[in-house]
Amino acid sequence: MNHRGKAQIMLIKFDIYHDGDWWCARGMGVDIFTQGKTLDELMKNINDAVELHFEENIEAGEEITVVSLTEFQVGSVAKISGC
């Protein structure tokens, strides 16, 4: 916490992409990389990787909250007749 008693928020952005059979996440601005077979597994692995990366900070009493915002680019969708 900072000197005013408010927890500091650390925002870590991840580049998430699909590579073969794996969903991959690369931290932007931090050396974190993880992967999972599903998006749910990837999100769990991101949380685990962040905890490991910032282990010393957590042991020193800092609170780190992972907030995920996922954005996907979708290709063109076929037009459905009648719509």
Label each region the model flagged.
Residues 20-22, 31, 78:
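Residues that cap or initiate secondary-structure elements
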Residues 1-15, 44-83:
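Short, charged, surface-exposed hinge/linker loops at domain edges
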Residues 19, 41-43:
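A periodicity- and composition-biased signal for non-globular, repetitive helical segments
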Residues 27-28, 59:
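Residue-level signal for pocket-adjacent positions within structured domains
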Residues 30-40:
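A short, exposed loop/beta-hairpin motif centered on an aromatic-Gly-Thr core
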Residues 15-27:
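Short aromatic-glycine-(Arg/Gly/Cys) micro-motifs in beta-strand/loop hairpins
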Residues 24-26, 35, 44:
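Short acidic, gly/pro-rich beta-turn/loop elements at beta-sheet edges
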